[in-house]
Amino acid sequence: MVTWANFLSQLFNGLASGALLALISSGLTIIYGALGVLNLAHGAMFMLGGYAGYVAYQATGSFAAAVLAGALSLVLVGGALERTIIRHFYARPPEDQLLVTFGIGIVIVELVRLAFGSLSLSVPPPAFAAGVTPMGFMIYPTYRLLVLGIAAIALALLYVVLYRTRLGTIVRAGIEDSTMVGMLGINVDRVFMTVFGIGAMAAGFAGIINAPVVSLTPDVGESILVQTFVVVVIGGVGSFPGAILGGLIAGEILSLTSMIDPAYSQVMLFAVMTLVLLLRPQGLLGLQSRE
């Protein structure tokens, strides 16, 4: 029997996981929106952020240092990958872009497996968030509330960068017409490298704040990648607000349906995605198709 306490707990679980999915998906949609590249290595970057944070935590014992390492290391990795590999595929067919990012993801996963093995690792939450918080007639894990807050702040910061800064104006202009941006004398290569780094950072940041919730393994990014693509399709490819809306919808679907039968959670998520594709192919808040 489902009680109100159980229902509200699952509702908050959905918000927390939805905010995390929104953060990951925002990185993917920023990369696709500005560069036109569907990054199949995004799940591996999520995983790599978790492991980078794990290394930092083992070295310092500080969760804050782990979070910084998970985010900043992926800025560097993303920028380096864009500069050395990805930029050579912008003019190539989409299937080539998919293959190269898929290959990058496999290389990252296997390098991590070689370095750390396949056994699960964990990063403990900060001491102040290790317990539970009373919330009326239920108690809820404090760290999950922290995840919700951190993800919301990160999404707000990304929104400010995209909609309140010169870089954001250039990125959004590139989403509409990247050729025009180049004609204005802007260093498109540098902007594209920055965009890919920001997108990778969003995945890495999500990876480390998720590490105290779900144990780290080299394959942890696989299911996240699938869910992220579903979120992007539901919200709208290339739409930052759509990534947030899609993430929250997906999080609640996965959480609430698990009360009935966890086996149906993924089925319901894909059913909703199919319904959105039938009724609104561009997604709930999607942009028009790229030319």
Question: Language-model features: where?
Answer:
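Short, non-helical or kinked segments that cap or interrupt transmembrane helices
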Residues: 19, 26-50, 91-97, 167-170, ...
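Alpha-helical transmembrane segments within multi-pass membrane transporters and channels
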Residues: 61-105, 111, 245-250, 280-281
